[in-house]
């Protein structure tokens, strides 16, 4: 069982087979699979606890409805792992509160019908035969809260959401990798063989393998080893409403594909987000500021295809609204970077474009299979060098 070790509870080990930088969900999953593969693995995290940056502001959703074939396959594998998570981490009865109430994508544009058909055809071809293409009448019959403006919908009952911190701690407890908090990486040392050591404010760890799982800060950490990663970060905000009264508790995650706005029930509350098209890429941020104009804007956009949100907006009180913000980290084709860098022994697991929760299980399994040689480098679709060589993957259309 992995432990979380703060500076007052113990010193850093002097060596490890693998050092993972970052203890968000991607770092925790990377360490879990590495330790399960028999590699002596430790995680270093500069904050006081695991999961305090992007993971802490996650919408906690999981889905296998994507447009890019490699993403579809990865997210399908992840969701399968999450459905049997207690068995995966070997913690009998461990509960991540997986709610499979589905994902419903909607459009009011009749001309988007062929695009929806194309995406569903691709998903069916890759084995997701349960994904449904719904005409307007069927959408309204099954989801009566949807406006008559809707033209077509896509639905997958298997998608849903979970408790991300339970998932994070499940990976930590189920693995054999300790997490050293308040540990800042200041250098990655190299020799003629590649990675040699990780230098931190708490000491130096000798290692021949380093995994960068630092979310928005991944490019900055890679630069310590002289590696350029073309990572971009943009702000994304979410609103949680403590009281709403009219949001159907059995509703799926609903996505307005025209605007990018989404919402879902959240126990007795609700969560809304998306639709931010104008934010420009920025440097990675420890604290991402919020905009108090955002709740009104997102509620207005949500009401476009789900009119009940207009009544919620009319009588909402300030103390019922909670805003948080994080950063989506992505590269040009909106697909993750998983695998080795030009420096031998230096690996990266990042750029999930705000969807690290759902990508972390399968993406981290792939990463460790690349480290151990179970998967050949040439069989990895998410390699960093695809970006430099211009061999980008088909751009992922379904980022929200």
Predicted regions and their residues:
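Active-site lid/adjacent beta-loop-alpha segment flanking the redox-cofactor pocket in flavoenzymes
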Residues: 243-344
């Amino acid at each position: 069982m992995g432990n979380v070790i703060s500076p007052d509870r113990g010193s850093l080990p002097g060596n490890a087979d693998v050092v993972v930088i970052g203890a968000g969900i991607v770092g925790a999953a990377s360490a879990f699979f590495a330790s399960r593969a028999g590699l002596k693995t430790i995680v270093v995290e500069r904050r006081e606890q695991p999961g305090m940056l992007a993971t802490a502001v996650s919408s906690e959703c999981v889905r296998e409805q994507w447009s890019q074939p490699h993403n579809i396959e990865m997210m399908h594998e992840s969701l399968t792992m999450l459905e049997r998570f207690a068995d995966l981490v070997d913690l009998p009865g461990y509960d991540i509160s997986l709610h499979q109430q589905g994902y419903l994508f909607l459009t009011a544009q009749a001309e988007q019908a062929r695009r929806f058909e194309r995406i569903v055809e691709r998903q069916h071809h890759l084995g997701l035969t349960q994904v449904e293409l719904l005409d307007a009448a069927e959408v309204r019959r099954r989801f009566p809260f949807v406006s008559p403006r809707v033209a077509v919908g896509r639905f997958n009952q298997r998608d849903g959401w979970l408790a991300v911190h339970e998932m994070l701690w499940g990976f930590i407890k189920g693995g054999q990798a300790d997490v050293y908090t308040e540990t800042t990486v200041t250098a990655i040392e190299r020799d003629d063989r590649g990675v040699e050591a990780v230098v931190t404010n708490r000491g130096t760890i000798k290692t021949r393998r380093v995994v960068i799982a630092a979310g928005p800060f991944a490019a900055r950490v890679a630069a310590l080893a002289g590696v350029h990663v073309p990572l971009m970060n943009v702000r994304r905000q979410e609103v949680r409403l403590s009281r709403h009264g009219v949001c159907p508790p059995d509703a799926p995650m609903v996505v307005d594909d025209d605007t990018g706005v989404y919402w879902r029930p959240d126990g007795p509350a609700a969560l809304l987000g998306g639709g931010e098209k104008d934010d420009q890429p920025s440097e990675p941020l420890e604290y991402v500021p919020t905009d108090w104009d955002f709740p009104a804007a997102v509620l207005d956009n949500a009401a476009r295809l789900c009119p009940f949100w207009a009544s919620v907006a009319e009588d909402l009180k300030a103390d019922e609204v909670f805003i948080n913000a994080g950063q989506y980290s992505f590269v040009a084709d909106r697909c993750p970077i998983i695998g080795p860098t030009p420096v031998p022994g230096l690996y990266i697991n990042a750029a999930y474009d705000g969807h690290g929760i759902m990508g972390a299980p399968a993406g981290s399994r792939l990463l460790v299979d690349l480290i151990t040689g179970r998967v050949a480098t040439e069989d990895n679709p998410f390699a960093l060098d695809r970006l430099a060589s211009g061999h980008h993957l088909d751009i992922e259309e379904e980022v929200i």
